[in-house]
Amino acid sequence: MTTIVSVRRNNKVVIAGDGQVSLGNTVMKGNARKVRRLYNNQVLAGFAGGTADAFTLFERFESKLQMHQGHLTKAAVELAKDWRSDRALRKLEALLAVADETASLIITGNGDVVQPENDLIAIGSGGAYAQAAATALLENTDLDAREIAEKALNIAGDICVFTNHHHTVEELESTVELPKPTA
């Protein structure tokens, strides 16, 4: 599988992922690009799961973004509806992490759309390790979103055999002032 992590801090959002593609217990490729920019570079997306399945979902999600003029939540909900109702899509095994300048979402294979706590997303085989690392870094450091995502991926790559240290990182800067999280 893989590890994808998304962190939002100080008006920046990052989605980062490793590059490992595995077939069973064999590494087939180490430099796959599992994080992309979509919709005129205004949306970031990363996938964990089957590569062919993820490309299908990227295409579907991008068409939903076009249909809804880049509105992230509407596009995600419409994709999730299709994912639930379309027999071919229901067989796809992948998770998507998506973000724009105002929201971060997880779109799951069973058609759920989840807005994570603290705008932190970590999915894939190393997701739990990356989430733990990113949470600790968010709570105890002043590192920026990119540094946190990269460090979390490195920690996941040290622990998870299906995650490597070849990273793709995409970053958006928000022009919208977001409310500060409350304790």
Curated annotation (Swiss-Prot):
Coiled-coil segments on the chain, per record: none
Gene Ontology BP, a term: proteolysis involved in protein catabolic process
One GO MF term attached to the UniProt entry: metal ion binding
EC code(s) of this entry: 3.4.25.2
Domain of life: Bacteria
Key word Ligase present: no
Keyword tags: Allosteric enzyme, Cytoplasm, Hydrolase, Metal-binding, Protease, Sodium, Threonine protease
Residues that coordinate or bind Na(+): 157, 160, 163
Reaction(s) catalysed (UniProt annotation): ATP-dependent cleavage of peptide bonds with broad specificity
Known role: Protease subunit of a proteasome-like degradation complex believed to be a general protein degrading machinery.
PANTHER family to which the protein is assigned, alphabetical: ATP-DEPENDENT PROTEASE SUBUNIT HSLV, METALLOPROTEASE TLDD
NCBIfam families named among the record's database cross-references: ATP_dep_HslV, PRK05456.1
Subunit structure: A double ring-shaped homohexamer of HslV is capped on each side by a ring-shaped HslU homohexamer. The assembly of the HslU/HslV complex is dependent on binding of ATP.
Listed name of the protein: ATP-dependent protease subunit HslV
Lineage, highest ranks first: Bacteria, Pseudomonadati, Pseudomonadota, Gammaproteobacteria, Vibrionales
Underlying gene: hslV
